[in-house]
Amino acid sequence: ANKQLRQGRTCYKHLAGRLGVGLTARFRARGLVDRNWRLTRNGEELLTTWGVLPGESSTENLVTPCMDSTERRFHLAGPLGTAICRIFFSRGWLERLGATRAVRLTPAGGAILRDAGLDPGEYGSAL
């Protein structure tokens, strides 16, 4: 696969590639999404500060795991994955690379993740 697409891309309307898988792993390690793929109270609080949470009053069925085609690990899909991707683009935390599905975190996006204890590290680096 193309290096840029493998690093970060959109999969339908959510984040994929190393960026999507890495962010998902950090969400799970920090207890923002539980082992049953449900958003936790801590996850709700963080995502509310980002303006991400969809309008539903229930957090049931917000998160769907999606197997990443290049990384062979899960990334976040479903309404929550879509909302995260949409907000990251609209706030300038994520940018598309040309007319492709390839994306990368902007410096502002990296700072937001670091501030939340979700250091993007290697998975968020631009190529």
Language model feature labels by segment:
Residues A1-L127:
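Long, charged, low-complexity, helical-prone intrinsically disordered regions
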